[in-house]
Amino acid sequence: KHQTFAGILMSLSIVGGVISGGFGINGWALVGIGTLIAGVLSIVADVLRLRPSGPLFYIFAFMATASVPFDGQLWEAALTGVASVGVALVLGFMGRLWARRTEPDRQLAEAPLPAWSRIYAQAGRYVVALGLAGSIGVMSGLGHHYWAMVAAAAPISAVGASGGLVRAVYRIIGTYAGVLLTAALLTIQWPPLGLAFLIAALQFAGEVFVISHYSIALVFMTPVALMMTEFVAPGPTGTLVADRALETTIGAVIAFFVILLTTRKQRAQERSLRQTQTN
């Protein structure tokens, strides 16, 4: 059920991004629309209790597809999104069947619905952080301001306020290492099929580390985003990696301070809980 809802939101985000790009929406208008979508989808994701939580992946899909040229038809983008979601759902269902065979007595309890005050507060953090990050990205003149918005969304989506602060720092460290790896990989002229296998391998490595070592995961996941961008809209490698590093710094720093300034009570509760568990 949760995967289905997430797949629907992802497909709608892709289609919405393609439509926005087709109308030539960019700059300030795109930042405004993306910020509004992030706030709304934050509420939707929390109400549906989706995991990973928050609008991070949906806003990334929307902003990325809206920011690059698309010469195909809308139905092609929609079909690609729906087909990808379908494959993911089938794989998820197969995993569920396997789990029932290997762990028949295991029951997965659904997470409780958060308090509405917390849901609205979290949505507000996304709106403030992404709005500021996108605005600074536009004013800076860098070429991919939505990267700053994605970098701002990632720490806020972390479990716990303290975890969000740590993730903001890890986001910067991992991205810096990732852009160095990207620069090295882009010295090679990859054929389309070779690039597809490389991206799949990097994505797999990123998923292996994303839960336990977030900064290491970004070393592999950063080249995925940048090499796909380079494939769709080629440009100077130096500009590409510099934009990624700078805009990630903008977004992560903004997220750090938004979390720091709006979660004082929550962080105190987390510290108290950790002390209780330790004792």
PLM features: what roles do these ranges have?
Residues 1-220, 228-279:
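Alpha-helical transmembrane segments and their membrane-interface boundaries
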